[in-house]
Design a protein with these regions (language model features):
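Phosphodiester-processing cores and adjacent nucleic acid-binding clamps
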Residues: 1-193
Length: 193
């Protein structure tokens, strides 16, 4: 924050991945700066982990778990002379289960900060947590008031559309990005960037 101030900035968003652990330090340092006569605004938020639908993910997870059990059963039968390779239990299926994208959420108001705290807290619940605290469209829809949403970085939601569709065509990339952007616009309105 000091460095930003020294370079002429009067505000800065600092976000942690999946939590708001640094927020208290940001708040305390902003108070210190104010006491020193430095007019500086901390912007509170989180760089969240996002999956489009936790319910859909849960179905995929349950299917992968079942496929793994089937593969084990089939593997045990291998010694009896028959074996079927089950592709559902391969590494790519595991990667898709742990896949998540980044999404930056910033508080535009006290209500927005309260909603960000609620989103973070819920993302750690058993229903949403899988290796990382995750949020989906349904959860964001419930707690979007006062929240600004940014599409984030190269691991962000729009970048994901590029990485997933780049080998199909430029048009496929644009269609996927437009669909995602429309969903976020529906939730956040003009607070999605």
């Amino acid at each position: 924050m000091e460095r930003a101030y020294e370079h002429g900035m009067d505000a800065l968003a600092l976000t942690d991945h999946g939590s708001a652990n640094g927020l208290s330090y940001q708040l305390l340092h902003a108070k210190k700066m104010k006491a020193e006569g430095k007019n500086f605004k901390p912007i509170y938020g989180v760089e969240a982990y996002f999956v489009p639908s936790v319910a859909d993910w849960r179905k995929e997870y349950d299917e992968a778990k079942l496929d793994k059990k089937r593969a084990k059963t089939l593997s045990d039968k291998k010694n009896e002379g028959s074996f079927i390779n089950d592709e559902g239990s391969d590494r790519s299926s595991k990667r898709s289960l742990s896949r998540r994208r980044h999404l930056v959420l910033l508080a535009a108001s006290q209500k927005g900060l309260d909603n960000i705290f609620q989103l973070i807290s819920t993302s750690y619940d058993e229903e949403y947590f899988y290796r990382y605290p995750r949020m989906d469209f349904d959860l964001l829809r419930k707690h979007s008031e006062g929240v600004i949403c940014l599409s984030a970085c190269m691991s962000g939601v729009l970048a994901a559309a590029y990485w997933q569709h780049r080998e199909e065509s430029d048009e496929a990339v644009l269609v996927a990005m437009r669909e995602l952007a429309a969903e976020f616009k529906d939730i956040f309105g003009d607070r999605f960037y």
